[in-house]
Structure formats: C-alpha cells, structure tokens
Amino acid sequence: MPTLKDIRVRIKGVKSTQQVTKAMKMVAAAKLRRAQERAVMARPYAKKLKEMLGSLSAKVDTSRNPMLSGRSEVNKVLVILVTADRGLCGAFNTNAIKLASKIIHEDYPAIHSKGGVSLICAGSRGFDFFRKREYNIVKGYSAVFQHLDFSTAKEIADIASGMYLRGEVDRVLVAYNEFKSVLAPNLREEVILPIAPEIPGTESSSDYIYEPSPSAIIDELVPKHLNTQIWRMMLESSAAEQAARMSAMDSATENAKELMRTLNISYNRARQAAITTELSEIVSGADALTN
C-alpha cells in the first residue's frame, strides 16, 4: 500500500502535468484560430481555380495537356503524405499514416510489390515512420509546419509534376487531414495528378471570349492549380492538427483533474487510517499502564 508521502508526490506530479496540458490547450487554441483563418481564406481561391479549369477544359482537347490526360495503365504511384511535426495531438498522425499505408498495401498492392510506390512526406511524424521501414521516399520535410510557407507547397508540386511529366509516376495522390470542425476531423485521399477538371453542364456554362486562347490559359493555369491545391491541403492539415491537439490536451486536463480527485480520496483515507492506528496504539498503551 502506498504511503502518505508516495501519494503526496504523485498528487504533485499530476498537478504539474495538468498545468502543462492546460497551457498547451490554450496555445493550441490560439494557433487554431490563426490556422483556421488561413485555411478558410484559401478555399475560395482554390475552388475558383478548379471551376475555371473545368470551364476551360470544356472548350479544348484535354488530351493535348499531359497533366489533364490520364494514363491508360497505372504502373507507378506517388503518395504525398501530410502529417504533423510533433505528437500530443491524439490520433491525428496515426490516422494519416494508416491511410497512406492503406493506399500502398490495399489499393496498390501489386504496384507496391514491384517497388512502384514512392512517397513524399510533409511532416516529421510521417517521414520518420516510413523512413525507418525503408520505403521509397523521394523527399521528406521536417519542421515544415513550424513556419508554414507557400514555397514548400510549390516545391512539392514541382517535384510531383516533374515526376509525372517524365513518366516516373502515373498517378499522384495526397493523404491528409481536412479541417471541418474541432470535433470532426476529416481524413481525405485525393488524386491530384492527372487532374480531373469538373466540366460544367450546358445549363451552368457561360459563353466567354478568351484572350489568349483557352489552351494557352490552361497551360498557365494547371501549375497554379496544382500549387494552390497542395497549399490548401497543407493549410487544412495545419488547422486540423491544432484542433486535434487542443482536443487531446483538453481531455488530458480533465483526466488529470479526475486522477487528482481519486488520489486526494486515497490520501485522506490513508491519513485517516494512520490517525486511527496511532489512536489505537495510544489507547492500548494507556490501558497497559492502568493494568
């Protein structure tokens, strides 16, 4: 049975941990507000680019642009995995890594067995996981979300598009956490190459005059679209990470509070038992002297 000193030490340790988790929750809440604003602001631009690409694609022969025309066979795949740089954010990293593993081992098992699956890992957690297991990692990024910058998204897009255009991969997918709300993260898997533009129907399409030609605009728009989509996904993941961390630290704080309550009850019971034992010894000693 633990002594009073042991229980006091444990109560002190739990209280110290509770203060840390409470502070981390407050920091995550502040970061979440900023990350959420950036993610929400990026959505309309990315959506409009996608709509423009779809509208223009209806006017031209998309087979002329290799990034819009899919390959007849998929023999090599590139998976872009977006995780966090740190832990203490619940199942955020685990879920993203599980999704990437599912893509590799369940969606493309034959290609993986032939060594045809490559990875780009944005975030230390995913990078470390797959590096230790000796997967084919084209590029790994660590500490990328401490100072998230558009240049990183552009670099990833350039690597992916370069590999696709050179025929080194036939399909590019992204596995990431999309931010929906604090309590409802959304794990997503999206194919970004080849690009599948959403061509509007005849009812929603408008008659525009394009200058220069639609094909020339598409050639300029495709790289911008790819850069923007990857940037949006990284912003979504950043916001989802902070939401997951805030939720995890809130749960940890509540658990610490409950544990302290249990320890205080144990401490009071042990103290009461010690006092009762001392009183019994005093009474027994007094009776012995009387007799």
UniProtKB/Swiss-Prot annotation:
Membrane topology, from the record: Peripheral membrane protein
Keywords assigned: ATP synthesis, Cell inner membrane, Cell membrane, CF(1), Hydrogen ion transport, Ion transport, Membrane, Transport
Single GO cellular component term: proton-transporting ATP synthase complex
Cross-referenced PROSITE patterns: ATPASE_GAMMA
Xref: InterPro entries: ATP_synth_F1_ATPase_gsu, ATP_synth_F1_gsu, ATP_synth_F1_gsu_CS
Pfam families in UniProt: ATP-synt
Keyword Lipid biosynthesis among record annotations: no
Listed GO MF terms: ATP binding; proton-transporting ATP synthase activity, rotational mechanism
UniProt subcellular location: Cell inner membrane
GO-annotated biological processes: proton motive force-driven plasma membrane ATP synthesis
Gene3D superfamilies given in the database record: 3.40.1380.10, ATP synthase, gamma subunit, helix hairpin domain
Family membership noted in the UniProt record: Belongs to the ATPase gamma chain family.
HAMAP family hit by this protein: ATP_synth_gamma_bact (MF_00815)
NCBIfam families listed in its UniProt record: ATPsyn_F1gamma, PRK13425.1
Function of the protein: Produces ATP from ADP in the presence of a proton gradient across the membrane. The gamma chain is believed to be important in regulating ATPase activity and the flow of protons through the CF(0) complex.
Quaternary structure and partners: F-type ATPases have 2 components, CF(1) - the catalytic core - and CF(0) - the membrane proton channel. CF(1) has five subunits: alpha(3), beta(3), gamma(1), delta(1), epsilon(1). CF(0) has three main subunits: a, b and c.
Protein name, entry field: ATP synthase gamma chain
Organism placement in taxonomy: Bacteria, Pseudomonadati, Chlorobiota, Chlorobiia, Chlorobiales
